[in-house]
Amino acid sequence: MGDWNNSDAVEPIFILRGFPGLEYVHSWLSILFCLAYLVAFMGNVTILSVIWIESSLHQPMYYFISILAVNDLGMSLSTLPTMLAVLWLDAPEIQASACYAQLFFIHTFTFLESSVLLAMAFDRFVAICHPLHYPTILTNSVIGKIGLACLLRSLGVVLPTPLLLRHYHYCHGNALSHAFCLHQDVLRLSCTDARTNSIYGLCVVIATLGVDSIFILLSYVLILNTVLDIASREEQLKALNTCVSHICVVLIFFVPVIGVSMVHRFGKHLSPIVHILMADIYLLLPPVLNPIVYSVRTKQIRLGILHKFVLRRRF
């Protein structure tokens, strides 16, 4: 591809390639992704509606699950428009301003997911290690402040990224590797010195995903230590069972993130399609699987869904 310099352009335009080399199956892939988005949308909306309707679920743990569901909706909807435009409508062009906005939302929701998972780990820590103080520590006001802090942190760390990208010139082509805009994907097209942006991005990842994962791990070390001090084995299993759903969603989020990082750092020899699929998985897997995990593993939510969609229709 020839050089593409936007120095004189009013606004540069990027080309979203979707799945390079698999253009002949884009229509079939669009069906699969539409189904995945539909599952994510219906699952998270169901979780939100059940928690909203059932007064017995108006508790700290379920409020955090609601925040996670809202974030998962945002994460899936941030990639949906361009994904379907590329795969379904064969419309790969995207203006730079729209691209910057999309990557801002994608990365904000990603970091917000990590923040919410950390808050949920804190919820489990307080519930198991300090059960008598649980209602007084995690009040509605405190939960609201935690949610706001998570949002502000995510917005704050991501906001400089598109602001820096707006001042860059791009002379290494205009084709992006994915069906949506990602920070590193846009950055590699720049002919401006991008070390500041690149270093900032690395620092943000370490300070958010890295620190969050360490504190989540630490919380479970403390939880396990408390559980082992419980005399009754039945009570031990009961306490641990309340953490299973959260552990599952933590793995669903962090395992693909680690996989993407490993492939990006050490998988230069791999086919580009592997990198693309890994990015798609890490963005789409949590919104699709999280509501399924909570529907299957959390008894109160499962009963709420049955009451809302099955029992009410019978009567």
UniProtKB/Swiss-Prot annotation:
Pfam families: 7tm_4 (PF13853)
Transmembrane segments annotated in the record for this chain: 28-48, 57-77, 102-122, 142-162, 199-219, 240-260, 276-296
Xref: InterPro entries: GPCR_Rhodpsn (IPR000276), GPCR_Rhodpsn_7TM (IPR017452), Olfact_rcpt (IPR000725), OR51/52/56-like (IPR050402)
Positions in the Cytoplasmic compartment: 49-56, 123-141, 220-239, 297-315
Glycosylation-annotated residues: N5
Main location group: membrane
Domain of life: Eukaryota
Cystine pairings recorded for this chain: C99-C191
Similarity section: Belongs to the G-protein coupled receptor 1 family.
Name of protein: Olfactory receptor 51L1
